[in-house]
Amino acid sequence: MFNLMKTAVLMAAITALFMAIGSVLGGQQGMAIALVVALGMNFFSYWFSDKMVLKMYNAQEVDASSAPQFYGMVRELAAKAELPMPKVYLINEDAPNAFATGRNPQNAAVAATTGILRVLSERELRGVMAHELAHVKHRDILISTISATMAGAISMLANFAMFFGGRGSDGRPANPIAGILVMLLAPLAASLIQMAISRAREFEADRGGAEISGDPQALASALQKIQRYAQGIPLEAAERHPETAQMMIMNPLSGGGLRGLFSTHPATEERVAKLMAMVPQRV
């Protein structure tokens, strides 16, 4: 129920952003049009955003015959988590990363890069996939997928506000300074919304994944290894679609600046410390 409320709040916040941009573009008429567009986008995001994200990453579905070891691992973990078997995808990227998407546990998918299968041990990979299934179990996947697709749409509308100007409520050309401010602040607002819902759920998914796999130390080791590789190997699809970065188990975006300041992921050191605190102490 709580995650359903978070989804409703997310949709309402993004709808308000759409209307603000519409007001800059075309006054009251623009605001009304933006409301209609936002409602349509909310509907589209609910039903199709998972397919859209998987297509962005050119993810290929696999099964027990094409990827028996990986598919079997996901099936075993899903059974332990008492979840329906999700669809399983592989992404042909060297950068190690993974994510989950879908409307609900009955319509979920998990995806991993070929790079993560190469660099992690089987034990570490189990920890990562258990983390993704924890997102499914906690019903985070709808929130993250909707916020990714809607953030991209907001950035696009903000660029329209800058390059095509607009008209105020009196029919005169809109203030170009307002257009510039919208272009700068709307994507920032979308990022802040993503941050608000993303950081806390990563900690929860770490904890839940450790409980599913029964091995918090393996997930901690995986996070450290993914971070080391991520610093030198860019995830090309995420660089093209940065709004999807918050879906990943580790922030895949290169560079610092605003991207680092407004990261949707908690510090890896903090995540590792929380996981290691779950490891039973030997007497």
UniProtKB/Swiss-Prot annotation:
Q: Which GO terms describe its biological process?
A: proteolysis
Residues crossing the lipid bilayer are 7-27, 29-49, 146-166, 177-197
Does Magnesium show up as a keyword for this record? Answer: no
List the active site: 132
Any one cellular-component term (Gene Ontology): plasma membrane
The record's annotation in CDD domains points to: M48B_HtpX_like
Q: Which cofactor does it need?
A: Zn(2+)
Cited InterPro entries = HtpX_protease, Pept_M48_protease_HtpX, Peptidase_M48
- Its Enzyme Commission number(s) read 3.4.24.-
Q: Which family does it belong to?
A: Belongs to the peptidase M48B family.
| Protein name, as recorded | Protease HtpX homolog
Q: Gene name?
A: htpX
